[in-house]
């Protein structure tokens, strides 16, 4: 527990643009999934200097409530994604950081 009484141990939020078309599938247990990449670019102050921040991260969306929101996601659209991060092992054996979305907000 933090001094602020917040229970935050794995919380991540990122604003960025959708970098590719969402890929949808259904698990053997019948759960709908959607995967796409979000690209973030910004300028941040660090140690008194401005630096460019850039990342491209996989976004995993699962379950019926959020999957409905993915129907209107298009490449280039700006989103706020909030969720938790975990590592997935890709088919080539490399670990990749993935943001599992719990909240999605479209930014105009």
From Swiss-Prot:
Keyword list, A-Z: DNA replication, DNA-binding, Primosome
GO BP terms, alphabetized: DNA replication, synthesis of primer
InterPro entries from the UniProt entry: NA-bd_OB-fold, Primosome_PriB/ssb, Prisomal_replication_PriB
The name this protein goes by in its record: Replication restart protein PriB
SUPFAM superfamilies associated with the record: Nucleic acid-binding proteins
Domain SSB as annotated: residue spans: 8-108
Stored Pfam families: SSB_1
GO CC entries: primosome complex
Organism: Histophilus somni (strain 129Pt) (Haemophilus somnus)
Organism lineage string: Bacteria, Pseudomonadati, Pseudomonadota, Gammaproteobacteria, Pasteurellales
Top-level taxon of the source organism: Bacteria
Oligomer status and interactors: Homodimer. Interacts with PriA and DnaT. Component of the replication restart primosome. Primosome assembly occurs via a 'hand-off' mechanism. PriA binds to replication forks, subsequently PriB then DnaT bind; DnaT then displaces ssDNA to generate the helicase loading substrate.
Function: Involved in the restart of stalled replication forks, which reloads the replicative helicase on sites other than the origin of replication; the PriA-PriB pathway is the major replication restart pathway. During primosome assembly it facilitates complex formation between PriA and DnaT on DNA; stabilizes PriA on DNA. Stimulates the DNA unwinding activity of PriA helicase.
Similarity annotation: Belongs to the PriB family.
GO MF annotation list: single-stranded DNA binding
């Amino acid at each position: 527990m933090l001094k602020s009484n917040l229970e935050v141990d794995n919380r991540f939020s990122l604003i960025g643009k959708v970098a590719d078309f969402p890929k949808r599938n259904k698990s053997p247990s019948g759960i709908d999934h959607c995967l796409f990449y979000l690209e973030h670019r910004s300028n941040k102050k660090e140690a008194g200097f401005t630096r460019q921040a850039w990342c491209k991260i996989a976004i995993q969306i699962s379950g019926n409530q959020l999957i409905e929101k993915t129907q209107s996601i298009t490449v280039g659209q700006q989103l706020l994604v909030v969720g938790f991060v975990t590592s997935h092992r890709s088919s080539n054996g490399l670990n990749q950081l993935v943001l599992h979305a719990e909240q999605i907000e479209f930014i105009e």
